[in-house]
Amino acid sequence: MIYIITVFLAGNPDDSSMSAYFMDRLKNNFTITYLNNGLVRQIGKGPEILLIEEEKIISENINNAVIVFKRDCTPLLSGKFLKENTVIISSYDKSNLKKISGQNIETITCGSSPKDTVTYSSSDDETIVVSLQREITSFTNKAVLPFEMPIKRLCDDDYNILAFFALSVKIGFTEKNSL
């Protein structure tokens, strides 16, 4: 059975900092098919990830996907998300959190609050220690219990690192696979 993980990066498609970081981190373990503004690019080797950068999200048409809201994004949302999806969002994004609140969808918040699903406990110029605060069920239906893990700081945006870590946990690419 061929299984493709679909990931939408919601927000301005001209801001490619998140997609560049995600692709760079995943390309050694996954085949990534990247779609953005008519551009199609494929890199890497391994299980398939479809990475779509899009400003307009027609949520009722998306099924079994991860929707990652970019920092400071204003995606054009249409409809309610289906419960089989997962949203990864900054806890500082109050506007979009309000739009998805009350929907029966797994929401993973990322930020510096102890209430966030994914946060960090320490940070320096080279490493950020990321923390999963609550259990997440991966796409393989494996319960991933809270844990901490140091990650090399390969980008300057802490939210991109936290969102990548959340996605990694969701797709089963966790502590056994060095990030």
Specify the residue positions occupied by each region the protein language model found.
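Short, low-complexity, polar/charged sequence segments that are solvent-exposed and flexible
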Residues: 68-72, 86-88, 107-109, 126-130, ...
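Glycine-rich loops and low-complexity Gly/Arg-rich segments
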Residues: 32-33, 74-77, 92-94, 111-116, ...
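Phosphate-binding loop of NTP-binding sites
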Residues: 1-89, 95-103
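Adenine nucleotide phosphate-binding catalytic loops in nucleotide-utilizing enzymes
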Residues: 112-179
